């Protein structure tokens, strides 16, 4: 797709909502992960724990054009310094700790008989016979799980899930019928 876009003068954008996780899990520098894209957006709330926000990275021209479109769509905000400060803090202090989320996800994976080696970041996909019953059973015991389809569930660890929380959730999940 990138080659086609380049041939036709089309800019290529990377939705980097989980780019921080990919960076920490793979050890690949962010610059390398974003190579070949004209713009990249990175989320400051998913994983990093900022209250809101994303950052758009690109050339001055691309970012200026994005600001124009943001204004046209009425998406501008005023007095956002405190939110910017929270985002800056998250980038400075929460990127490296994403490895903890990844380790917690592997704990959940093991409880569900999912090979932990297949869990690269903070998201676990598992196959269960009755996802609706599984989700309900987990919820009754204080563990939130998302149904993905007729035989699949998804679990996500994050800044607010400690190693102790993951261990407790793993006990709950392991006891549920799958």
For the regions a language model picked out, list residue spans one by one.
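Conserved PLP-enzyme active-site core in the AAT-like
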Residues: 1-128, 132-141, 145-161, 165-177
């Amino acid at each position: 797709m990138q080659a086609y876009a380049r041939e036709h003068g089309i800019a290529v954008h990377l939705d980097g909502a989980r780019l921080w996780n990919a960076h920490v899990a793979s050890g690949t520098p962010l610059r390398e992960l974003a190579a070949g894209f004209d713009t990249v957006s990175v989320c400051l709330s998913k994983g990093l724990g900022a209250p809101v926000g994303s950052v758009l990275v690109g050339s001055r021209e691309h970012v200026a054009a994005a600001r124009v479109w943001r204004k046209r769509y009425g998406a501008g905000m005023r007095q956002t310094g405190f939110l910017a400060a929270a985002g800056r803090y998250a980038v400075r202090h929460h990127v490296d700790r994403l490895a903890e989320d990844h380790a917690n996800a592997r704990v959940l994976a093991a409880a569900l008989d999912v090979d932990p080696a297949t869990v690269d970041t903070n998201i676990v996909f598992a196959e269960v016979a009755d996802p609706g019953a599984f989700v309900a059973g987990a919820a009754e015991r204080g563990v939130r799980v998302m149904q993905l389809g007729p035989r699949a569930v998804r679990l996500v660890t994050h800044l607010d899930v400690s190693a102790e929380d993951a261990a407790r959730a793993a006990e709950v999940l392991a006891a549920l019928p799958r």
